[in-house]
Amino acid sequence: MPNFKSKKIKEINLPYSKDDVEFLWLAKNDNVSLIYTKVQEESFFLQIKKAQNGFVIKGDKHTKPSKIGYLQKALKIFKEGFCEDIINEAFGLKNNALIEKTPFIVDNFDELLSRLQGKIYIEIGFGSGRHLLYQAKENPNVLILGVEIYNPALTQVAKLAKAQNVNNILLIQSDARLLLSVLKSKSVEKIFLHFPVPWDKKPHRRVIGKDFCKECARVLVQNGRFELRTDSFEYFNFTLEQFLTFPAPKFSLRKNENLEISSKYEDRWKKQEKNIYDLWVWNFNQECKNYELNEFNLSSVEFSKEDLKKIEQNFKNITIKKDDFFLHFESIYKQDENLLLKVAFGAFNKPEHCYLHLDKTIDFAFKEPFKIQENIKAINELKEILKVQFKI
């Protein structure tokens, strides 16, 4: 994560803007200050944290922009405008950093869903993008949707797609399980999962599970196919067991088959003479329906100045666990007379992190989380906790 360390920070008078970077407002607690930052069409927090002999300035990991160049540029402008005695820095803004909006990266699910059409392939954890770009070139009439947790991978593959004149890809930063949950039923032709982290000693952390397999079956078209490629026999066998719970699935099992394209991980495993396993699954015959999305309905909550004082005074770092969702109050920040809450919530295997801005009403400081049922339930619980636990 790009960052730098400074001995001194000047007085921060906001709003402040320079070179398409805007610092609009600041919220803080005893240890951390958050600066609401806009670069072109994206918003995120810069984080200032007290450290030994100074301050560490970096991007907040739960609001970081989809393009690393935005964060690098914001750090550069903040350093030049507000900092003295720089101790060290690790955010050099390169001339080829991806700053301009790229059509290959979508910022949220609403934008994604509006752009999905025709035949769709999904690659989960596309990494360096070798296989994803290969599929895009081989299937020019198919939209290749790549989902990846790590932002740098999105930026790298978007650059490669532009350089190679590949136009039929879309990339999104997300947990794959969350992505599948928002897609329409029977809308995807193929799902690729190549060389996932096997988690052989911690199988509960695997993306594969019963719910994931059900979602694959729901979103795949009739005779649509799930394809796993892995060097872990344990992962291969575990995945097979999950799909065997369906009534009459069909399988293709292969070992050490050379494909037309090889990822950097596959190259490494072959040099180590590891076995490579392929598992293809289709014919799920899964009855399914599209989910009806509800609203968060935050407009029903109103606060007085006295309410906000009580929330600030009575705030506790607490976690509420229900059968199918959780809610964790992580931190609270003061923004003039208003408050900022950081919370984690949602399904246990698809957690969300977000900031809520509290003034006379309550709203999400950034984009809304997607309206899956677990998130709706968690936000409804949050509204009740604010009234009961924090005594307003």
From Swiss-Prot:
UniProt lineage: Bacteria, Pseudomonadati, Campylobacterota, Epsilonproteobacteria, Campylobacterales
Q: Kindly indicate whether the keyword S-adenosyl-L-methionine belongs to this entry.
A: yes
Native source species: Campylobacter jejuni subsp. jejuni serotype O:2 (strain ATCC 700819 / NCTC 11168)
Q: What residues bind substrate, as annotated?
A: K201, D231
As its record notes, the protein acts as a catalyst of:
guanosine(46) in tRNA + S-adenosyl-L-methionine = N(7)-methylguanosine(46) in tRNA + S-adenosyl-L-homocysteine
Q: What is this protein called?
A: tRNA (guanine-N(7)-)-methyltransferase
Read off the Gene3D superfamilies from this record: Vaccinia Virus protein VP39
Concerning CDD domains, the annotation shows: AdoMet_MTases (cd02440)
Question: Which Pfam families does the UniProt entry name for this protein?
Answer: Methyltransf_4
* Cellular component annotations (GO), alphabetically ordered: tRNA methyltransferase complex
Query: What Enzyme Commission number does this protein have?
Result: 2.1.1.33
* SUPFAM superfamilies registered for this protein in UniProt: S-adenosyl-L-methionine-dependent methyltransferases
The cross-references to NCBIfam families, in alphabetical order and at most eight, read: PRK14121.1 (NF010719), tRNA (guanosine(46)-N7)-methyltransferase TrmB (TIGR00091)
Please give the function described in this protein's UniProt entry: Catalyzes the formation of N(7)-methylguanine at position 46 (m7G46) in tRNA.
Pathway noted in the entry = tRNA modification; N(7)-methylguanine-tRNA biosynthesis
UniProt keyword terms in alphabetical order: Methyltransferase, S-adenosyl-L-methionine, Transferase, tRNA processing
